[in-house]
Amino acid sequence: LEDTLSKREYDISKQYLAHICEKISDSVVDRQYLKRVRALVDYELGEISAQAFIKQLQEAMEMTIPAYESYLWGDQRGRIYPYREQEILILMGMGIAYYDVGELDKDIIIYETIIRSLDAGYMDEKNAAELKLINLANLARPLGKLGRYEEALAKAEEGLNMAISRGYAHGLVELMMGVAGCRMRIAKNSVDTKRKQQELAESKKMMQQAYYIAAARKDKYNQKNIAENLNYHFGLEM
């Protein structure tokens, strides 16, 4: 199931879910996992709205942290909460939905909250590092959308550099495309012709590298997405 989720093969994920439902225990942790994954799959398949997705994730979070909202935008916001991995994945799902509906301030708060918790050392170092680099890339998206291009690039590059230094291949293509996207936005808004050309060249190079990595991994989703971007922005046929 996790492999199909990482490859965005959500129709196959749905089939796995049907089998898992028959075998899963009645523990809170298992029910929370099932609720999160089912909501994600239904949302990505277009079967529920972003608001319904958020509501289901909120219900999943409340299974283990009833007052979780107070740590995000309530009176406990300044306090670092020791989130478990499953709770972080639920928050990341909320981040996806808030970005999609344009609630970018909430999106940023969620990713910053996750990163602070991961930096606090509550989780084992390897898992925390892998989750952090993904959330750095996630944080770059709303920052870029709000025109905070340099901040977005810094976060995206921090995540990519972490992945490279640790030999973390799983999210490498997405991280590279995040950096390439930030450079594209900087180029588009730059009045410095030399920098504009430099950022475009770096973006093109990174997209091409990401394409070949996706192709080697038989990652058809990202391969198609990158090919479309290269064709649209640079007129390249891959």
Locations of regions flagged by a protein language model:
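Tandem amphipathic alpha-helical repeat scaffolds
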Residues: 2-8, 33-47, 86-103, 131-145, ...
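TPR-repeat structural position
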Residues: 10-11, 48-50, 104, 149, ...
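Aromatic-anchored, glycine/proline-accented short structural segments
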Residues: 91-163
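C-terminal non-catalytic interaction modules
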Residues: 188-238
